[in-house]
């Protein structure tokens, strides 16, 4: 874990004596008295940090040293700030000492929060910080607001209950001040008039928009300049925490001035006529509040409602600013980020005050119309879709175009964007109930959604684990099963789709991917287009699936395809867990046929095929156990599968479970429609397969069948014979011959001696049972009350009652 040298230093730090430590403290205090930063001072601070951090318990430093280290937090040397902050984090704060918030910087702010012993210490610290926001220059040194506000936000994130009604009112007013009334001039502007330029040319320049024009409105995060004032930085900080504030802290207050929705609608509409008559902040001591007049309507609003109104205006201005063409590419990305945040904040505001919906929707609708043709704004349009989902019904707007864009175009064209994939799937997961109510058609787009999984399986698997159950419906169950089984093919097709647009069409004599040539070939275009479909409903699967698998044979080793194949079994289990809750017996019978058919129609990936067969085996057993009548309903297909000897070698796991299901549930006790003729037909099919595999060697390239297959066939024959006694001589004769054959030595169909012993033992057990048909039927086909006993529930059959009766009889005189 540590090198030998590091372990030695840690050991020395832990074993240092108190006397030596006190001398070290005194020497360090003397070093801190010098103004210059020496190497000895830096080494001593490093050593002090090692001593403090290597011990289990925190130490208390001498007060003089503690004060010197605290003073270093405001040192011009960044290195000293970092070292002093690290040392102080490892110490206990002096008892009873007030927190120093006069000269906050990033290191000092982090230290204040880290030295809070528990949540109980946070309310006092929060109150002290909030009080510092009210300090005026005339009252003394003003702490740095740029570090105070983020620290307050961090405390409230950990402990929202720190906030009192008075604190909330103050912060609401301050946020209004910072958001709406930051200065509109920039600092640091250089004069362009030379030495003889007049005072007018040296006046502070106004802030500018991203397109370079002079800003004619209030300052926002999208305004630019050569430098920014503190209140402009506070504007940026306030906007960055605004959504969290609205979601978390607005519910704390008990606002007595809240009016009903109709009154708030009337008040809010009064603000939409003009922004020139805006009220100014009412924070006590604010210069702005002393020189500005408030409108009559704004006086009716509480601080909470005023913040809501100013937030609305701020977001509206941001959306307008994003119409401008930015001069820098980085500013274009900033516009997108601000659009996302602005729309999310408007969504929060409308959820809090529904009357704002009618003022907000025209702008949101115009924003969607402007951005919907440019898919580079896809991540911006997702919050717009969220707004439509949350408020579209109230505003009575048609959302069909929004859902068509989001569900159809985004996954089809941007499946390889990992950030959009995360945002898109998160949008679906968080809004499942709302989408099922407002846009139930979203389940039709599951072939499109699965493109995210096919492209980036490990990153989004967890999302689909949550999302898949909502996509399983009676109408889509069969097609969804086929689509899940074709996930590796879809992954390969998406790779080919991207390569076909980037790689040139090769010359006839050059070497290229056969699958890429097939993708470009019009003959096979329909196969790939089916996989790339955006909506369900065009068919459950395709007829030439084996041809598609041959075309994609080389893709079986592509890393992306291999990763995708590993996720399919997980999702299939989730699929079947859901489908049994929504499907009727007719649909479940169809799914059994699909499993039998698709067990032989999978992309040639040995590990993948083995895992899918294991899933099919498990789920087939489960479906038949839930609905035994399915075995009779699908008896012809099951018998056809079980009667094909090749399935023993290629689909061993599925075959074994099909045979077991036939032997277990093909019985009159499970379904009254089960006739002797059906039992005999099944017996003859299984008998022929068992005779064939035990009388000859496996086909070339195949291994000997597992003993589990043979013993399952033998048990199934014995079960069927116990239900039709005319068949007992036939199975008894076969079991006797099998025992005699194995006595002659090794056999070609079983290469392991232990396996052979297990097979013979099972045969002898079955043969002994069949000698007494009544016992065989009771053991091999027990009645329902034996399979599902209720003795622990039936007091008349309870064992304690019987023991009590026997005890009474034996002890009676």
Please annotate each region the language model reported.
Residues 1-813:
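Extended, charge-rich alpha-helical scaffold/interaction domains
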